[in-house]
Amino acid sequence: MKSDRIKTVDLKSDMPPVAEALLRLDREIALARQQKLTLLKLVHGYGSKGVGGDIKIAVQARLQEFIREGQIRGCVYGENWSTSDELTWKLLQSNPALKQDEHLGRQNRGITIVWL
């Protein structure tokens, strides 16, 4: 994997319906590919009650579809975004600048890292 910056995409800032958030996700992944980016940090929130919001659930389900279809290489949910996670460690090894990411090791359930 080539070294690359991570682009942050806020999918939930204006509290869109789930369908709109998924359209944004699709557009942002397509745009990231055009820009030759390899990493996205998705901000989807985790629900107002802290138990998993509809946008988070839908986004993570869509990402799993993309993995199965070979459209993305992988993803790391925010709660796993730490040096003890195997994929996180691989991404950190190939892109040391990620070690400065403000969410690394914080178990932030409101984000997901996408490896394109």
Task: Mark where each language-model region is.
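Long, charged, low-complexity intrinsically disordered regions
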Residues: 1-116
